[in-house]
Amino acid sequence: MRLSVKAPAKINLSLDVLYKRPDGYHEVKMVMTTIDLADRIELIPLPGEDAIRVVSQNRFVPDDSRNLAYQAAQLLKETFSIREGVAISITKHIPVAAGLAGGSSDAAATLRGLNKLWKLGLSVHELAELGAQIGSDVAFCVYGGTAVATGRGEIITPISSPPPCWVVLAKPPIGVSTAEVYRNLQLEHVNHPDVDAMVGAIEQQDYAAICRSVGNVLEEVTLKKYPEVAHIKEQMRRFGADAVLMSGSGPTVFGLIEHDSRMQRVYNGLRGFCDQVFAVRLLGERHSLD
């Protein structure tokens, strides 16, 4: 039996870093939501083999233990003494190293899919706990939908989904090191977003308040070092997005837009100078294990 699983990207509507913890991680508080830009994971049993094979049409996707989907399969095999092999085919649509949790979502989709393929019977909560061992964003990606993430990002509290709107994303042709961004973050000199205000706006389904409440403390570092990201933000505002923010540590910038005609204007304007531009919708529902 082959199994196909969708692996949607996420954006951060609000991202705050509170302090650096004794274990070296940063304590964060953020609101994340999934969007309808997704990779496709296909899981293919390998009868008679006890191996994990990863293939992708994208040459930037590693095919070994550096790949988070590979790590997800390896973790399940080791934890539950699975002696079955699997091929993991990853069709990439989410840009790589973009601040959209593409690798984490691939890992989460692999966990959900192998839970079914190998008949492990794990709950979403149990899968998320396993996912947190792989990476901070994997736990959220197991759940999907919209949630507040705390701790180092692995403590997930699901909340209501925002009202439907367009999300236009633009990724400049640069890579940003998340570790470097956190290293250069000076918490005493940044403006901290009001994450609770974002949660309240979502619960009230108040689109205007959501747009007013977007914020990302990591912009303070990335925008200074990468003027291309700041330029995309400026242009997205100029073309008419209702709210504009960098996702994660960057470099992808997204705009929230309510109306179709304005979305088209923003999308077309950005396509004039940026190769990787996407117009997608927010995804309201959480993942099901069915």
Curated annotation (Swiss-Prot):
This is 4-diphosphocytidyl-2-C-methyl-D-erythritol kinase. Keywords: ATP-binding, Isoprene biosynthesis, Kinase, Nucleotide-binding, Transferase. Its EC number is 2.7.1.148. The keyword Repeat does not apply. Transmembrane segments: none annotated. Catalyzes the phosphorylation of the position 2 hydroxy group of 4-diphosphocytidyl-2C-methyl-D-erythritol. Pathway: Isoprenoid biosynthesis; isopentenyl diphosphate biosynthesis via DXP pathway; isopentenyl diphosphate from 1-deoxy-D-xylulose 5-phosphate: step 3/6. It comes from Geobacillus thermodenitrificans (strain NG80-2).
